[in-house]
Amino acid sequence: MKNLVKNVVLITFFMSFIPVSYAQDDVEEVVVTANKKAQTAQEIPMNISVITEQSMLERGMAKPEDFLRTLAGVSTPGGDVYYTIRGLNTSTAQTSSGTTSTFIDEVGGSSMHLFDLARIEVLRGPQGTLYGSNAVGGTIRYITNKPNPDEMEAAFSFELGTKSKSDDSIRSLNAMINLPINDNTAVRATFSSSEDPGIYQNIATERKDIGKQEDDSFRITLLHEDGPLSVMARYGKAESDDFGQKEKGNADKPGSADIVNPACSYSAEWYYGDTCTRVFALAAGSNFSYDPDFAFYSFTDEQEQGETSVLTEVIKYDFGKFDAILIRADYDFETTAITDWSRIDTDDLYTDILYYNSSGSRDTTELRISSKPGDIEWTVGYYKERFDSDPGPTEVEPTDAGGFDYVTGYMGFTSHSGGYDPTLYPAPFNNPYLLYGSYNYYSYTEEKAFFGQVDFKWDNFVLTAGLRDFELSDGFKGSEYGIFYEGDLGCDGTSASGTTCSEENGSESDTRPKFTLSYIPDEDLTVFLVSSVGYRNGGNNAALPPFCANDPEAAGFSRRFKSDEAKNTEIGVKSRGDNYSLNATYFWVDWTGIQVTVRPACGWSFTYNGGEAETSGLELDFSYNLTSNLYLDFSGSFMSAEITNDIDSLGATAGDRLPNVAEQQYNVGLTYDFNVASNPAYARFDINHYGDSYATFAEDNEDMSPSYTKLNLNVGVQLESSYVQLSIDNLTDERTEAFRFSAESPGYRPRNYLQWIPPRSISVQYRYGF
């Protein structure tokens, strides 16, 4: 594999120089702001992909899931939020992006709807100098269309479709209006709503719509420009409602758990092997008609609802010799969820629901000063971010009378010396059948940083040097309640028995550099060399509960973990001619002090610095105009991602492949422009190949998501100010696991999580704008 990559790199670099002499007369430049200043995608010294508004339309992209698996170097277990770039992932069960960051314009955030966006910028490689923590593998930026004072604009679209394996319809509605107030001021408002039907079936509750996702969002933006002054204010709000189990591998997208095996016979025995559990047997005894490929058995249908709002102010001023920008963002968020814990605590015999609630705020401030274009260009800035969670109950887990007697029975009433009485706890933990609860007194993280970057230009060369000097601090204080704790009397020493107290604080500081050297002999060729470093914030773990003490996966537990470091080196070339463009990059990353998130089968989780890894590979973006109206494009990556040290608690040995990483992936697209009754029309056909991946280091077949090839078709026609488009996703209805994870410890409670790639969907979309 490594020799193949090296050979492809050499061939690609050699070929990229051959057609340089064919100059382009007319080049439609794509301008990006990835380096906090306007540059063309051709000249910027990094591997960047740009998805334009027109490309989103032609490819039928409505949500991030539609493009994430088509990008070179991007791996995701599915869904719209969680992804990794360049293989930088070690979590055996990925529930946070961790090594990547996402921005909407100048502030952190993600867009669930790809509507009224000017473009999407995908920045590969560590971006810690300008974008701070978590931009280890890269950054994705959603660039919105801004208010336009010159004219009134309006647009709307609606989509209606069907999805294989679901009786419900795909629905989406988007609307935008732009209103000029005067020559210098305008307001722009957008609204989006979507519903993606579920395909999973819960035998216990006899529901066949598990996995349904509903998302609503709006934003309203005011822009005022007066000479050197520009002021933009925006308020946005997003709401989500996900109905279904969010499996360990991907807390973003509902999936299924413990797919029914028809070969399992009904029995009261606890354990039949790795593929037959008690839930299989219970399901086999049900009269509910179900599809075994999509069915599972869970006492309770899980649900999660989220709400996020953000107020943003951006003030720019042109001082003549330099530009200054102040960016402020205030976030408020709340998440509520109900999850089924009958698998963990009551052995699928009794109802056991864990109610979760989290709310808080996040404030960010960035002040940046940049020079004007010239032989020496510089940017310096200050950044501050503060996150605070609201005090209050976060988790409450009551069972019923039967479940309570069952748990106290198998614990032999050894807990609390046989005198466990949850009614002595404060509300809402005073439920007589409470098994577990948690309370947050405070939790915060804070990051402060000074950063700078300077470009030196001479002849056809540009040297860039950057540095970020950061300080991190964080802390929390909380209590836990329940039958699993005894003897503790809380933080003040006067609480009822079984009330723990956890308090931890910490801080650290460090620097992260960046250097690039680019050679630009003309507007059609750029060769660049990059050395950059990324990092993730350190933090604290809550105390390990006693019921996890003997779990082998908890062997590496410690109360504090620090920032990790990813040192990236890459060499790339961007070349274009009359009918082609090529972007090729070879990278290698040395990742140390890795924050490994461990989620033992006991139901807990913690993070520690326990890993070292290396990733390397080739990323290719290529387009070629076959004729004046037939266009070919290719985007793909071929990489190696391996751990370089043993991690006993995860069963990882040096040389093992990093989890949830597809080492090969590519997307080939063919677009054909034509006319229908004198109206412009297009047809686009995509072949998307995604390589296999494993949820754990062990590379066990039970944790393997196989490779697949999916076909998509989009056909559209423009009718004056409107578009009509037919989209078919997964044309052949390919059935493959997008994510699969088996938790087999402890052996009597195995859990098998599964998420299919989206089945075939057929939809019609209508867009109108003026």
Which stretches of residues belong to each language-model region?
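Outer-membrane beta-barrel translocator/receptor signature
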Residues: 98-99, 114-119, 124, 129-218, ...
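Membrane-embedded beta-barrel scaffold of Gram-negative outer-membrane proteins
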Residues: 174, 314-318, 323-329, 333-339, ...
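Gram-negative outer-membrane beta-barrel transporters
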Residues: 374-379, 457-463, 581, 586-591, ...
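Acidic, small-polar-rich N-terminal luminal/periplasmic segments of exported/outer-membrane proteins
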Residues: 26-151, 571
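Structural signature of Gram-negative outer-membrane beta-barrels, strongest in the C-terminal barrel
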Residues: 222-225, 369-370, 375-385, 441-589, ...
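Outer-membrane beta-barrel domain signature, strongest for Gram-negative TonB-dependent receptors
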Residues: 207, 213-379, 386-387, 582-583
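Solvent-exposed loop segments that connect transmembrane elements
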Residues: 199-209, 245-297, 340-354, 394-440, ...
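C-terminal beta-signal and adjacent terminal beta-strands/loops
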Residues: 402, 677, 688-696, 717-770
